[in-house]
Regions:
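Glycine-rich strand-loop-strand elements at beta-sheet edges
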Residues: 7-65, 142, 147, 169-175
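Beta-rich globular "head" domains
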Residues: 1-12, 151, 155-158, 162-166
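Predominantly extracellular/luminal regions of secreted and cell-surface proteins
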Residues: 108-122
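Collagen triple-helix signature
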Residues: 44-47, 59, 85-91, 114-117, ...
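Surface-exposed ligand/attachment interfaces on beta-rich extracellular proteins
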Residues: 53-56, 99-104, 121, 138-154
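Acidic, low-complexity glycine/serine/threonine-rich segments
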Residues: 45-101
Length: 175
């Protein structure tokens, strides 16, 4: 039997919203037979620049023992398209829709793998949504903060954190 911790690739941050953490799954006592197993480690997504051509990309899935952790959702941009955070293992934070001068939406997380990205906080001075993490949604601790990663999977004396979301950007104001 084996125990596993599988984390997918984290997403790129958009020109404004933070990228979501890669989805994270754990398991204990999984029965395996002697043999060779293929394990795919998902790559991280690319960050995007502000503007119409700067859309970020999602992280890639990680797969092991027939279990798939979903790549993180990219953060939203400041543009006429790509302003919404994307769905992913953990969702991407919201950006800004320059067509309508309004906030984009944040991306949802995947159940059991991570949380949603955060919303744009205009009263805080156009602080864009943080990416979701394994332990909480983006912008939970404060506007623009990435969601916390999960703890409790340490080996030895340390307690590392896994699958934390990226922080959102901030601007001087959009109109």
């Amino acid at each position: 039997d084996v125990d596993h911790l599988i984390v997918a690739g984290g997403a790129g941050g958009g020109g404004r919203g933070g990228g979501g953490a890669g989805g994270m799954l754990t398991g204990t006592g999984v029965a395996v037979s002697a043999g060779t197993y293929t394990i795919t480690v998902g790559a991280g997504g690319d960050g995007g620049e502000s503007g119409a051509t700067g859309t970020a990309t999602n992280g890639a899935n990680s797969v092991a023992l027939s279990v798939t952790a979903t790549g993180g959702g990219h953060g939203g941009n400041n543009a006429t398209s790509g302003y919404d955070g994307s769905v992913g293992g953990s969702g991407g934070g919201a950006g800004w829709n320059t067509n309508t001068s309004s906030a984009g939406t944040y991306g949802a997380g995947t159940a059991g793998q991570g949380y949603a990205g955060g919303a744009l906080d205009v009263p805080a001075g156009y602080v864009y949504g943080g990416g979701g993490g394994k332990a909480e949604a983006g912008s939970t601790d404060a506007a623009g903060y990435g969601g916390d990663g999960a703890t409790g999977y340490g080996i030895g004396a340390t307690t590392p954190y896994y699958a934390g979301g990226g922080g959102g950007g901030r601007s001087n104001g959009d109109s």
